[in-house]
Amino acid sequence: FLMTTLASRDLRGIAFWLMGDLSTAPPPGLLWILVVCFAVAAGSIFTTASDLNLLLAGEREAMHLGVDVTRVKLVVYVSASVLTGLAVSVSGAIGYVGLLVPHVMRMLFGSDYRVLIPTSAIGGAIAVVLADTLARTIIAPTELPVGAMTAMAGAPVFIYLLRRGQS
């Protein structure tokens, strides 16, 4: 329905948002709300890193070591959902970044969540900036959606990780 009723420039904007687009910034009045929500959610996840390390041994073992497993799960699920919602509301859906970057960081830096969480966040930001730069320059002056670039790079890496895990 939308494709038949919207003007072509509106349709292009929707298509780019659906595939990821970093060409527009959030309105200034909304920016501080995004920053505060990001700081609270990211801070909440960072505070659970040690408990997440204990959860690697299993829920029962972590509970015996004093971890409130239900609380940690709730904090991580809610915080991750808020962070995902913030990112998608600003840039649209950019696939493969949240799936692949943490796996690559785990291969590079190990499984300690005190290291893995910040390196995954920084690695994801770097991956998105690189993908956006490629999307803007690869067929300049036309711009590709960022999600198209991450999919072209992410799909082969994902297949490699799947095959590596099976062997």
Walk through the language-model features, giving the residues of each:
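Alpha-helical transmembrane segments in inner-membrane proteins
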Residues: 1-167
